[in-house]
A protein has these predicted regions:
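Substrate-binding/active-site clefts of carbohydrate-active enzymes
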Residues: 3-14, 18-199
Length: 201
């Protein structure tokens, strides 16, 4: 963390390795965050990457094709260890000169009971009109960004990953879903905005 103030990233080469936990060739039954750190360190040193982009770092409970529904916006996946173990992984990578970026989905969340859907018994984070939010084929729903509690929830989550887990950057995924009401939907599955368009205002 202290080195961040001294490093002028714009004056240095940038090469990012994108990797998902599922693709790491280690024993899946016993893999933990330190195993992942060792593998990434060895691979990056051999190939010359400067950063690693880790996909699916937050807790996820379902994957459908290329997308996933997040359930723990403030917690790393417990499949590979505890939050403390995750911090040790980040520290190990930093000690070896490797920056860490994580995939972070602020476009939608899953509609599984383990997620934040109907968190307060109502639509705290989503919309009241199902056709605006639901993507049946993906089992997900989008955030209602006009709500102050939604903006606070997402901004606070990102700030926590940066401050508490000491990651170096965030990659915002699936921005098209955030911008367009009809993205990934068929006719009749979405509701136009107040002007009759498909933009998510």
């Amino acid at each position: 963390v202290k080195q961040r103030k001294q490093i002028k990233g714009v004056n240095k080469p940038l090469s990012i390795l994108e990797i998902a936990y599922d693709n790491i060739p280690v024993n899946k039954a016993k893999v933990n965050y330190m195993d992942i750190a060792r593998y990434i360190t060895e691979y990056v040193k051999d190939t010359g990457y400067t950063y690693v982009l880790i996909k699916g770092s937050d807790s996820i409970f379902e994957k459908t094709g290329y997308c996933y529904g997040a359930s723990g916006y403030y917690a790393p996946s417990s499949q590979y260890g505890t939050a403390t173990d995750f911090k040790h992984m980040i520290k190990e990578l930093h000690n070896n000169g490797i920056g860490v970026i994580i995939d972070f989905n602020v476009a939608y969340f899953g509609i599984d009971i383990r997620s934040i859907v109907n968190y307060d018994g109502g639509d705290c984070y989503g919309y009241l009109k199902p056709r605006i939010i639901e993507k049946p084929q993906m089992n997900i729903t989008t955030f209602a960004y006009e709500k102050g509690e939604v903006r606070s929830f997402l901004i606070s989550a990102i700030a926590m990953w940066l401050d508490e887990y000491n990651i170096d950057g965030i990659k915002i995924t699936d921005t098209a879903t955030m911008l367009y009401l009809d993205y990934g939907k068929n006719p009749g599955e979405w509701t136009p905005n107040m002007y009759g368009g498909n933009e998510n205002l």
